[in-house]
Each structure stands twice: as structure tokens, then as C-alpha cells.
Amino acid sequence: MRFYFLISRTWLAAAVFVTLVSHGILSNAQSADSELNKNVVNVDVYYESLCSDSMRWIVNQLVPSYPELKRHIHVTLVPYGKATHHRESETGPWQFSCQHGPSECRGNKAQACAIHAIRSSEAAENYQPLMVNLVGCAMSAGTPASAVPQCAQDVGLSTEMRKLIDDCIASPLADNLLATNGDKTDALQSPLRFVPTIVINGVYSKENQDEAIRNFPKLICRHLTAEKPSICNSESAEN
């Protein structure tokens, strides 16, 4: 009897699956997921906290367009740039050399800590806007290398999250996060040929890089295959 019951349950599950497929329910759901994935562009940004080109691109391209593009892009920010890192032993402290000096290393670490804290603490739909806003705030500040704590408060992060960021900055975790960013950067290009480097859907191309620097919304609109936001019809995305 028990064996028959198991067979019946298996047959019932198979019958339900066949019914769903025959009525197009599963295929429609899968198509919807596929269309959704097609309409999200992955954007990896390799940058430095004291690089004027990085500041200019984040402040003038990414931040202004993000509100209209946020449903269509997934942004990964990688503060490191043309730095180098090494350590004398597997357990020894990390040593960093940054293109614009020790203050840039501190700024890169602070932003890495902020990105890590937000990603670890916030729901997926919240962490991207908070990350973009915080980094945009820091990169537009007079002193980007030391702006993260104040920007964390300005963008509305909780007291607990601000403490997480401060604790990270003052701990070896900051070094480990920056070293991880360095490994990721080196895997792309070692050293980077230009900062910032913008990678679309995991693949670097000079065409995408040049267009991202000139007109980021236009680049994203060109890669969207389904529904496009209104910014794609604006003059800025067409020029």
C-alpha cells in the first residue's frame, strides 16, 4: 500500500507538470524570467577614490542616470584601480601602493568597507541605490578619501550600519576587502589601462568603454533588448 501511495504521488506530480507545460504556464513563466534577465545589464566599475576621471564619471554619468536606469542595471563597484598589493607571508599584513598615494588607499578601503556593509545588511532591492548614493556622495566631496563616514550619515544609513563601516575601516577586514578588489582587478587587466574601467555583462571591450565614458545611458539603452526606460528616448541618450 505504501509503495502504491508513493507511485501515485509521483504520477500526480508528473501529471501536474505535464498539464502546466501543455497549457504554457511554465514556459510563460520561464519566458518572463528570461526576458527579465535579458533586460538587466551588469555593470562592473573599476575605479579609484582620488582619480579625477573616476570622480567625474561617477558624479556626472552614473549618479544622475541611476534613478531611471536602476531597474535595468546591476552595478558592482570595485575601488582599487591601478594600485598594487602584496604580503610577505600568507598570514602577514597586506601592503598596498596606490596611484595617488596613501590617502587614496585609505579612501579605497573606506569605500570597500561601505560597499561590503551595505551589501551584507540590506535587501537586494535596497543595497544598490544606497551603494550608488554613498559612493556618489564620497566621490563628489572635497576629500573623497575621508568622506565615507559623513556620507554614510548623509544618505541615511542606520547607526548600526555606520558603526559596521567604522569598525571595518579600523580593522584588518578593510585590508582584506581591498586585496580582494585587487585580485578581481588584476584578473581583468593588470594593470588597468584606464581608470575608471567599465565592463558590461562581464566582458571588456574598448567600444563599450569609450561609450560608457562619453554617454553611459546611451550604452545601457543599446544593450537593453526589451522594455526600455524613458531616458532612452531623451536627447542625452541619443547624442
Question: Can you name each region flagged by the protein language model?
Answer:
Residues 2-5, 40-46, 141-239:
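C-terminal cap of thioredoxin/glutaredoxin-like
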Residues 3-4, 18, 22, 110-115, ...:
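Charged/polar interaction segments and conserved charged motifs
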Residues 39, 44-49, 55-155, 235-238:
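Structural alpha/beta surface segment adjacent to cysteine/selenocysteine redox centers
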